Amino acid sequence: MVGTLDEFRSQLIGGGARANQFRVEINNPPAGAVGLDTRNAAFLCTAAQLPGMTIEEIAVPFRGRSIYIAGDRSFETWAVTFYNDTNFAIRNAMERWNNSLNHLVTGQGLTNHDDYTADLKVSQLDRDDRLLKTYTFVNAFPLSVSAIALTAGGSADIETFDVTFRYQHFVTDGVIADAPSGPF
């Protein structure tokens, strides 16, 4: 139980991690001629997530009751939101990557897993832009590139779109000495 405001404040190390202090690194896959400007993608990324993970449960029936044991691990997809600039640089690159998996017209695509996947990263930063923790998404590829909503309603908003990636697993690197790190 929290005693006083000062005790609470002393437990909130670094003033708390801030949701707007992050950096993403989207790398090009070896094949598919994606041509993504990775620096531009890092700047124009407006939203990302630190990943989630789940251990499935296995129900084992025994005399009218179930005992639950840990099952397989599963990982959620990873979604990133980008601002769309007027040359569509990031959008075009994501469409090329997605198209290299299954061509819009021919239905053909890259079949060698190592040719169409790349490692991607999201890092939590502190308020001085120092790394607190980095998640590396291993062997990622884009599952979907979202639609961009257009409207004649007079809004002056900059277009955004989401890219959802599937990956095999993630690895963490904690900069803080006490933080556990390693593959998950």
Residue map of PLM features:
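Glycine-rich, low-complexity intrinsically disordered segments
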Residues: M1-F184
